[in-house]
């Protein structure tokens, strides 16, 4: 089960909800967050039964990050939360970076470099259409293949087999042993036909 939002960490008693879900035997329980409250909540989340966490972080550049996500907190706050999650024992930690041509594509290498060798797994995601809320433009899409080729040219990569059927990210290991990176081709190679997931809203539908 993956808890998502909006921002799930602003939900009252999120730790209580996680604790109730954690009582289900053999459940892999994870959560996706923007990281704004993670520094103060990481230990409580782990204690409640959360196994791992994914943090949305589209750039290490404050101006770009805040503009893309319409937030008023800096990248440093997110990085503090990631460090707190690691210290609390949430593992693995994954970073989701949505890449938009002409917006943050020039900052991809900086973000990848920052997390290489830390155990944190960066996943580069094609900018996709989510309805009329993000003013989607195909010209803004940087394909997963182009991203992979660019990363491979700087840090050689080796493919990693999927860990389960229907895994959406193509996984690669750094040839020098500095960890793993993933690429999600949500536009150029749609995977909806093989989806193994169901989404449940907060209203239960």
Segments (PLM) and residue ranges:
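Radical SAM/AdoMet-radical enzyme domain recognition
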Residues: 1-2, 7-123
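Auxiliary Fe-S-binding modules of radical SAM enzymes
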Residues: 110-117, 123-205
